[in-house]
């Protein structure tokens, strides 16, 4: 059931190719395994499910991935009996429950090869790493495809994941034991697919082959196509950013305050007003204005002034970060947020006066 659920998550619900909505099932009598494969042409997942018993020869067929997952979820018991009929039908039964559905031969299913890289490194903590980096990318940018990507970098200090949409940048720490000297550009959407299919404790062997980044653990192989290009030099940008002042706060409290302050926000803009140990977030719209404040701890410099930032980007950042956060304003007015595991920067917006409502004309009196 777990394997079927993963397959259903990866197989696209809507696709011009009906076969991509399917899971390819291959029974291998040599290894006594059921190989379950799904692909959306960008990423491919293959899982090996051990068979308790099997009669017959090697068999290959395709079945709607979400239908398979739904049927297995509703069958009682811990084991299920599968019987492939002669006329492209599959019967699933367990205890007193029974399903019979149509399947196809699987001949039209795209054979996406998952290569085994020669040099591989160990990696764990994938979901948290993806959460801290993928939010800053721009998944719908067709003009600059690299902004749809997360830049994974193996360094001597461990793995780093960088994301940017051109307005904000985040550099997040990954597994400290995953060291090396390589860089990979992978679409954030594909990396998020992997994060949905695994747990924080899962340890993968990771390597590159045939322009794909491959993640392998027992009974599980995931391959994602890589992008090519030169990514922005984020190390230089971060190193060149000097804060004029910094304050200490809690990411969750800051997120709640932002949520409260944006009740009247109509233009995706919020003003951060710093005044010593008090930070006030203000929004003004056609329907009115709102503000919310919280107490912060000044760390360096003199926290004072008004700075305007995009609400949606700041909100996504605060949802991704955890724990204590150091919030700063750089000389250029750029906002910085730093935690133990990530460093975030966002370009400020110009503060504009709210638009005044046009005065209503008095109705002319009837003669």
Residue map of PLM features:
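Structural preference for solvent-exposed beta-strand-turn elements
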Residues: 1-367
């Amino acid at each position: 059931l777990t394997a079927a659920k993963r397959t259903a998550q990866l197989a696209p619900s809507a696709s011009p190719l009906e076969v991509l909505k399917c899971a390819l099932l291959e029974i291998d009598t040599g290894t006594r395994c059921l190989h379950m494969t799904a692909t959306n042409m960008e990423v491919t997942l293959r899982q090996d499910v051990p068979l308790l018993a099997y009669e017959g020869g090697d068999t290959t067929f395709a079945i709607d991935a979400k239908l398979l997952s739904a049927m297995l979820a509703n069958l009682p018991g811990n084991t299920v009996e599968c019987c492939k009929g002669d006329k492209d039908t599959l019967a699933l039964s367990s205890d007193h429950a029974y399903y019979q559905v149509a399947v196809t031969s699987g001949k039209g299913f795209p054979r996406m090869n998952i290569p085994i890289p020669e040099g591989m490194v160990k990696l764990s903590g994938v979901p948290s790493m993806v959460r801290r980096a993928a939010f800053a990318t721009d998944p719908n940018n067709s003009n600059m495809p690299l902004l749809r990507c997360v830049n994974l970098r193996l360094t001597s200090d461990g793995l780093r994941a960088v994301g940017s949409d051109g307005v904000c940048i985040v550099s997040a720490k990954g597994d400290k034991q995953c060291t090396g000297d390589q860089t990979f550009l992978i679409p954030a959407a594909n990396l998020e697919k992997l994060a949905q299919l695994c747990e924080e404790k899962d340890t993968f062997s990771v390597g590159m082959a045939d322009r794909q980044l491959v993640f392998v653990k027992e009974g599980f192989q995931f391959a994602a196509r890589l992008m090519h290009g030169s990514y922005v030099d984020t190390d230089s940008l971060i190193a060149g950013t000097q804060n004029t002042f910094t304050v200490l706060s809690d990411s969750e409290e800051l997120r709640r305050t932002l949520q409260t302050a944006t009740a009247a926000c109509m233009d995706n803009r919020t003003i951060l007003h710093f005044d010593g140990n008090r930070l006030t977030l203000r929004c003004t719209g056609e329907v009115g204005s709102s503000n919310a404040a919280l107490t912060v701890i000044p760390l360096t410099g003199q926290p004072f002034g008004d700075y305007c930032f995009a609400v949606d980007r700041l909100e996504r950042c605060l949802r991704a970060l955890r724990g204590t956060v150091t919030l700063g304003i750089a000389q250029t007015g750029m906002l910085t947020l730093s935690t133990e595991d990530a460093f975030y920067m966002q370009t400020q917006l110009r503060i504009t006066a709210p638009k005044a409502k046009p005065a209503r004309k008095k109705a002319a009196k009837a003669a």
